[in-house]
Amino acid sequence: MADGRASSAQSGENLLFLTDEQLRQGIEAMFFAYRGFTADPDRILSDMAYGRAHHRAVHFINRAPGTTVNNLLNILGVTKQSLNRVLRTLIEDGLVESKVGKADKRERHLFLTEEGHALEQKLSDAQRVRMRMAYREAGPDAVAGFRRVLEAMMDREMRNAYGRLKDSGT
Amino acid sequence: MADGRASSAQSGENLLFLTDEQLRQGIEAMFFAYRGFTADPDRILSDMAYGRAHHRAVHFINRAPGTTVNNLLNILGVTKQSLNRVLRTLIEDGLVESKVGKADKRERHLFLTEEGHALEQKLSDAQRVRMRMAYREAGPDAVAGFRRVLEAMMDREMRNAYGRLKDSGT
DNA sequence: TTGGAATGTCAACAACACTGACATATGCTG
DNA sequence: CAGCATATGTCAGTGTTGTTGACATTCCAA
């Protein structure tokens, strides 16, 4: 199983495809690529009092304005205490606004302020530059495959969340 | 630039391909997929005194037995203090062996013990299960594209490290 | 022999996650 | 209205992983 042969019975067409070696290369590619993926925003954030967690919060609030805390919690997959620490600083610093819900006053709806939008732009611009280069270098067919594999790699709930966001974006 | 149109001048063929919206979907796919990617090993590790950093160390020592601390440092992209804390516990617990170099006695060459191999197997088995399912679901062409985009997303040094590991694996 | 490289270690600190407990306000249901 | 559930916020404690900075040891090479 660890000697380079296929690690499970495969039909002939797959014997040369799903070897442990091929899978391990994919695993390592994910590891190295994710480092690159986060490197640029991380560099920007390290000059401020913010970190990757702030980036994620700002990204998804921008993506789904008016989202509730609970919804954000589900998307980010962290505890409310962890998210709250991040949201508190963002609200204190005037990047995020929290509005009491109209229908249900227990809920808080989150919005980016102008300043919050500015940060989001700065971070996502940096991340898009790399993404655009990678997409252009690899070509449209590769991008389609890239997306298909990533989707298949997600947990079910994350795939659902991803689908909802994808559909909401025009 | 944030209104959904392509964010940089593109030739016609790319106007429908590299919109900010498409790029953002790719960014979110990476985020959600990476969560799935690490979920299974993380679950296993949380039952021990180990974390993701231990997994990474064990993975690359297994991949390149006899690697030096410095080499591992470059691959993992962390400080020696951070790596050392992880290596120390792995050595203390008898999962990793550190051998003084023959040619250069300053160097330490790292190897997995039997117990270390057992943990590596357990972790990478879990990770491969998900990878294999994703690969199978997406198909060979998608996988090729997946790998091409990921490679294009890496920093140069990481792409080099990745290439060396890839070539070393038969 | 001296300088520098490789390694290891100590201390302090920060970011980010977790659990557990508790408070507050609100909504819903009987 | 009473009681329970939900949504949010907060406090305290803890763990993992990363960082800087400082310093010691060992050893190679000029």
Protein language model regions, located:
Chain A
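N-terminal helix-turn-helix DNA-binding core of bacterial DNA-binding proteins
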Residues: 39-82, 93
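N-terminal leader segment of winged-helix/HTH proteins
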Residues: 1-48
